[in-house]
């Protein structure tokens, strides 16, 4: 039976759904971390009503915690939402890990830079990291000028590079379809339901993601990740995550890299955990965890 808890920091509390492990051998807890503009709903169920990854991995023997970033989903938003940083989310995740004990972190998209940083800063509380089309740490992102005027007219695959710092960022349906509902395996019949789950984002987080003014979240000591099982999982219909880019991320981290076409799986875009073969992908991740003794 699904329950919930509130965790996080005093400044940035977070809500997490808790899907308890099914009876049987117990494994490490899993914390599932969504990306920008999203919340944890996509790990609980798909927008077209199929079972999500959280209950799937609970059957494998994991207590699963699906966290909403501060100010997202059911996590309270503070008056400083426009100043919410990736490190703020990371510290909230670190507090949740103190509640769960050492856990495997699944991180999607913009959750990636947060997860890599948390693995470095809270090393004893992270048993492994599974990156799902994950963003890189700022070590791999060239710093862009801090002045907004320097980015006038610039875009990153369809949206402005710079987000005005004085107001939350929103996206429209065209953006949602181009950026996230872009793979041939996305459940297009449920696009409306999916679009209704998308909320505003902190402009600071977006600017950190593009390393505006060198503000991105960096790793300070990769040696702290040595020996940590890490996986980067990427599909072939995610134009902002080409094989070369995510392969370079995996190499930088010392992670395993699973380019899905290399095992005969094609058509996956950005939203791997809700696409029509999400059970197959979950099984691949479970197999990798098994290989790590997790």
Locate each region found by the language model.
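Short, surface-exposed "cap/lid" segments of acyl-processing enzymes
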Residues: 24-26, 30-62, 66
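Short beta-to-alpha linker loops that shape the active-site pocket of alpha/beta-hydrolase fold enzymes
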Residues: 36, 63, 68-73, 135, ...
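Catalytic histidine-centered segment of alpha/beta-hydrolase-like enzymes
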Residues: 263-278
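Alpha/beta-hydrolase
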Residues: 146-245, 255-259
């Amino acid at each position: 039976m699904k329950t919930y808890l509130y965790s996080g920091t005093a400044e940035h509390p977070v809500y997490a759904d808790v899907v308890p492990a099914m009876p049987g051998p117990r494994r490490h807890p899993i914390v599932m971390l969504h990306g920008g503009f999203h919340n944890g709903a996509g790990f609980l169920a798909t927008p077209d009503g199929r079972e999500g990854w959280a209950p799937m991995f609970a059957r494998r023997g994991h207590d699963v915690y699906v966290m909403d970033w501060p100010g997202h989903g059911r996590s309270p938003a503070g008056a400083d939402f426009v100043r919410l940083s990736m490190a703020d989310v990371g510290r909230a995740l670190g507090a949740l890990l103190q509640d769960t004990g050492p856990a495997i972190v699944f991180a999607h998209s913009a959750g990636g830079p947060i997860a890599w940083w948390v693995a470095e800063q809270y090393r004893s509380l992270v048993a492994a990291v599974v990156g799902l089309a994950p963003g890189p740490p700022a070590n791999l992102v060239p710093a862009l000028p801090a002045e907004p005027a320097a980015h006038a007219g610039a875009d990153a695959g369809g949206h402005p590079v710079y987000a005005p710092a004085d107001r939350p960022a929103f996206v429209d349906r065209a953006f949602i379809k181009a950026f996230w509902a872009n793979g041939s395996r996305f459940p297009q019949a449920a696009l409306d339901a999916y679009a209704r789950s998308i909320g505003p984002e902190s402009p600071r987080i977006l600017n950190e993601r593009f390393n505006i003014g060198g503000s991105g979240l960096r790793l300070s000591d990769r040696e702290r990740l040595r020996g940590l099982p890490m996986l980067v999982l990427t599909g072939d219909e995610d134009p902002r995550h080409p094989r070369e880019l995510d392969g370079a991320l995996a190499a930088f981290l010392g992670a395993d890299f699973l380019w899905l076409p290399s095992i005969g799986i094609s058509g996956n875009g950005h939203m791997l955990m809700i696409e029509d073969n999400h059970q197959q992908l979950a099984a691949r991740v479970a197999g990798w965890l098994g290989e790590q003794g997790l």
